Amino acid sequence: MPSIISISDLSKTYGSGFKALKDVNLEIEKGEIFALLGPNGAGKTTLISIVCGIANLSAGRVTVGGHDIITEATAARTLIGLVPQELHTDAFETVWGTVSFSRGLFNKPKNPAHIEKVLRDLSLWDKKDSKIVTLSGGMKRRVMIAKALSHEPQILFLDEPTAGVDVELRKGMWEVVRDLKASGVTIILTTHYIGEAEEMADRVGVINKGEIILVEDKANLMQKLGKKELKLHLQAKIETIPDSLTAYNLELSDDGRAVTYNYDTKGDRTGITSLLSDLRNAGIRFSDLDTTQSSLEDIFVSLVRAP
């Protein structure tokens, strides 16, 4: 699948000497949903701002749809719709007016049918004549998405799109994102709701301290770095784990009534069969068991905490 965004050796250094981005290399594939994850201050918004032409790069090269963002800035920017983290809207303009105006900024001809479709898809149609100042935070966020889609971009950046949005509106918003993907739009999102990234993304990138530390297909990532946890609920309380079970690195619950065993999802052998046998030999019986698997959030936390 061809790359629609190509980022090569990208760096950003501020006047103070702070390096916000350090030799970032990244390829975004056409038509995918790409989740860019990282802690606060990791460089997510800086990276997005450079690709969208809002901030200047210090070194490196970025192309969007084959257009260099510096030498062919207009052509590159026209392909992009951006929903920024901060809410910037004309408070006293109507929803219809501000979305239509955004389309005009890209020299697109008027297209009331397209504006209507966008507003309906985002459940904003009944608010089309309302002034933005009267809307809730979640509805204002939807207006920002409508503005970003007004000129029919091929790429949509969503920087924390569900911040301040209630659960019901959030679900509806992700339905719109799925429909956009189905229509061929490439979507790059950042979110603190990592469960959403786990559900929505095709690929995941993790950025920390200005460096891309991982880019992986989501399914492969979950398989390669995910762990499974087996929890055994004991019939009788134990004070300590017997020495004969040390090799399993079991965790004993505070009340002494459960042990937890972590095993690798990609391993040829899980070790569970031998564990159960050794537990029996140690005179430990269990009444119930359950298993859980690492979430994307668990993997993310382990990656950014790594030295």
Language-model segments: residues:
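Short, charged/small-residue-rich alpha-helical element at the C-terminal edge
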Residues: 229-303, 307
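Conserved ABC ATPase "signature" region
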Residues: 100, 104-127
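ABC transporter nucleotide-binding domain
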Residues: 174-264
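Conserved catalytic motifs of ABC-family nucleotide-binding domains
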Residues: 152
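Catalytic Walker B motif of ABC-type/P-loop ATPase nucleotide-binding domains
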Residues: 156-159
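Conserved ABC transporter NBD signature motif
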Residues: 60-71, 75-76
